[in-house]
A protein has these predicted regions:
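Short alpha-helical elements
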Residues: 1-215
Length: 215
């Protein structure tokens, strides 16, 4: 009969090979990209002071859903909904911080939510050939966008849909783990499973563009 304890022990040995496999299967560069992040809590907020497994690694962070204690997973997708780049950070890292590293080799257009607003970031990316598009806050003046760019920005919520799918399908709940390395294996395995799935959701940019044109 399969032994759960033995399985958990073997997980540690596949971490490096799994990372290498995932890196070799990252998505192609299409010139159009979406960026988003998601919180990965490691425990309930009322247990933060007693939490030991991720002590020194996890940090308090805040999203639109409120405060949490754990990590943030940052992902960049292309228009085929393939993951092009990823980074795991403590929960207190701002969404804009890992963007330069995540997009180091990318050029074209990058679409994100309001969390990625930042003049310096946009200028730095533009200097190396990547234009950042975000929605604006209520107190900001909206920049004029072409119909195509507006349609692409409106399609940004596909990134949230994909992240939700990855977390739900792979039961990406770090609060169940009692080992740091096994938790990281779980994260990499979940992302890899999505990446090699041939039936990814497709983004019909043509229909979105036509909808914007006729609106």
């Amino acid at each position: 009969m399969p032994c759960y304890e033995h399985f958990v022990t073997l997980q540690k040995s596949v971490f490096v090979p799994l990372v290498v496999f995932l890196v070799s299967h990252l998505g192609t560069r299409t010139g159009l990209y979406y960026i988003d992040s998601t919180a990965l809590p490691v425990c309930d907020n009322h247990r933060i002071n007693r939490h030991k497994v991720f002590a020194g690694l996890a940090q308090r962070g805040k999203t639109s859903m409120g405060w949490f204690f754990g990590f943030k997973l940052h992902l960049v997708f292309n228009t085929d909904n393939e993951i092009v780049a990823l980074k795991l950070t403590p929960g207190n890292v701002h969404d804009t911080t890992p963007v330069p590293a995540l997009t180091r080799d990318l050029t074209g257009k990058l679409f994100g939510d309001k969390g990625y607003i930042g003049q310096k970031l946009a200028e730095d990316l533009l200097r190396r050939g990547l234009t950042l598009f975000t929605r604006v806050r209520k107190n900001m003046k909206a920049l004029p966008l072409s119909l195509e760019d507006k349609a692409l920005l409106n399609a940004r919520n596909m990134a949230e849909t994909i992240i939700g799918h990855i977390k739900e399908f792979s039961s990406l709940n770090l609060s169940k783990h009692r080992s740091v390395i096994n938790a990281f294996v779980h994260i990499i395995a979940a992302i890899t499973a999505y990446q090699i799935n041939p039936f990814k959701p497709k983004l019909n940019l043509q229909s979105r563009y036509q909808l914007e044109t006729t609106a």
